[in-house]
């Protein structure tokens, strides 16, 4: 053995590490006992602004810091996101809140595959866009007579969301119903992947859509639509996207899950430093991520809202990634989601809400990861939540589901 190889070998031994001033157990980026079980992790994302914390953790080396060799895979639709996580082609994924529940329960065409939510990626920052031909409509109540007239003429209006059990579907249903419009009876509701929304509105395939940024502002920039409302006006600091894993992967790789969460904590803090947002917008605007002009991404990231109908404002409730206890996976939100599945007939009869929520929402991973980072966690779960039209009590989701005049309750 030559001298160079001997030194390399010695460096790998406990004595060699000690001689070099490194603690025994140190594995380069983490103590060996804390090293992730699986170091190669493939992340699925969709071309939306709220993929930012996953992308920036990759770009800034935060995944690497915690022993994760990350690969980012941009997918074409939420169905592909679900399927690749289900099949193990991706190990962690950018996902709509609601999708892990649908997969765990086998709802709406999802194969049964238990999934877990240990981390909320972001809050706020989605919107509903209407075609410019509807300018003048400011509320769902304004829209109702137009919807009714079209229905009577056998020219039913069409609205798009991104995935049936997901956030955009629920926000669109919630908004339409607030104006007395039944999303299952009065209009046609279709599924379109986020990056394809603007192109489909250009060819008059729909009258409106609900999606995340930057596609609402892109519709304004392209001169085809305007923002009638944002989702934060329905529910301030609502949950939006999550970082999801299959239950099987999380059970086998708990240290990997925690390493991912630690990296996301750092990237989320980085993004919520507003001085970093211009550079973040530039990074995520790349063709390999969102493929959209950085200026269109940045405006609403900064809370600068031009609604495209003459209304402009600085919205204090812009998209957040870390602030205001953003990342905590609160069970309250799971109960709300299940109440909406119930309201819209996606499940039949009362559900075992607690059993389902406890299985999917996993604050234990979050709490352990933050404790290991020395980060103090705050916030109280299972508290009433105020929405635009009332208060949700997570302790009685069945009563809440039955409280709406517009519904599709089944069983």
Where are these regions (language model features)?
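Stable alpha-helical elements in mature extracytoplasmic
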Residues: 50, 59, 81, 100, ...
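N-terminal export signals
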Residues: 5-29
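Ligand-binding pocket segment of bilobal, Venus flytrap-like solute-binding proteins
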Residues: 90-92, 192-227, 246, 278, ...
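Short glycine- and hydrophobic/aromatic-rich loop-to-beta-strand nucleating segment
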Residues: 128-129, 242-245, 249-250
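Secondary-structure end/capping motifs
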Residues: 252-362
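Short, glycine-/small- and polar/acidic-enriched structural segments
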Residues: 32-191, 203-220, 224-237, 384, ...
């Amino acid at each position: 053995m030559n001298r160079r190889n001997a030194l390399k070998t010695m460096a790998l031994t406990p004595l060699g590490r000690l001689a070099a001033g490194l603690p025994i157990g140190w594995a380069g980026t983490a103590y060996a006992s804390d090293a992730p079980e699986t170091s190669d992790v493939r992340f699925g994302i969709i071309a939306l602004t709220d993929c930012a914390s996953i992308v920036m953790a990759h770009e800034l080396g935060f995944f690497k810091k915690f022993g994760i060799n990350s690969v980012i895979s941009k997918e074409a639709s939420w169905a592909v996101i679900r399927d690749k996580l289900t099949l193990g082609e991706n190990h962690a994924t950018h996902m709509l809140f609601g999708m892990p529940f649908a997969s765990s329960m086998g709802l709406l065409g999802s194969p049964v595959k238990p999934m877990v939510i240990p981390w909320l990626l972001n809050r706020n920052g989605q919107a509903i866009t209407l075609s410019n031909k509807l300018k003048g409509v400011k509320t769902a109540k304004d829209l109702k007579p137009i919807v009714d007239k079209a229905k009577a003429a056998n020219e039913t209006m069409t609205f798009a969301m991104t995935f049936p059990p997901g956030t955009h579907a629920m926000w669109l249903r919630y908004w339409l119903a607030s104006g007395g419009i039944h999303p299952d009876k009065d209009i046609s509701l279709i599924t379109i992947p986020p990056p394809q929304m603007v192109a489909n509105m250009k060819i008059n395939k729909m009258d409106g859509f609900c999606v995340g940024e930057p596609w609402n502002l892109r519709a304004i920039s392209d001169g085809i639509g305007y923002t009638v409302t944002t989702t934060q006006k329905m529910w301030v600091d609502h949950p939006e996207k999550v970082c999801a894993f299959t239950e099987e992967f999380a059970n086998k790789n708990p240290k990997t899950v925690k390493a991912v969460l630690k990296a996301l904590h750092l990237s989320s803090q980085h993004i919520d430093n507003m001085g970093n947002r211009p550079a973040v917008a530039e990074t995520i605007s790349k063709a390999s991520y969102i493929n959209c002009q950085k200026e269109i991404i940045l405006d609403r990231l900064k809370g600068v809202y031009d609604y495209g109908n003459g209304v402009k404002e600085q919205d204090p409730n812009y998209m957040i990634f870390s602030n205001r206890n953003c990342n905590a996976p609160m069970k309250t939100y799971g109960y709300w989601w299940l109440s909406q599945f119930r309201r819209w007939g996606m499940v039949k009869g009362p559900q075992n809400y607690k059993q389902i929520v406890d299985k999917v929402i996993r604050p234990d991973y979050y709490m352990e990861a933050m404790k290991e980072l020395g980060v103090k966690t705050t916030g109280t779960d299972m508290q009433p939540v105020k929405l635009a039209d009332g208060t949700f009590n997570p302790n009685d989701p069945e009563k809440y589901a039955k409280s709406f005049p517009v519904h599709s309750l089944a069983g």
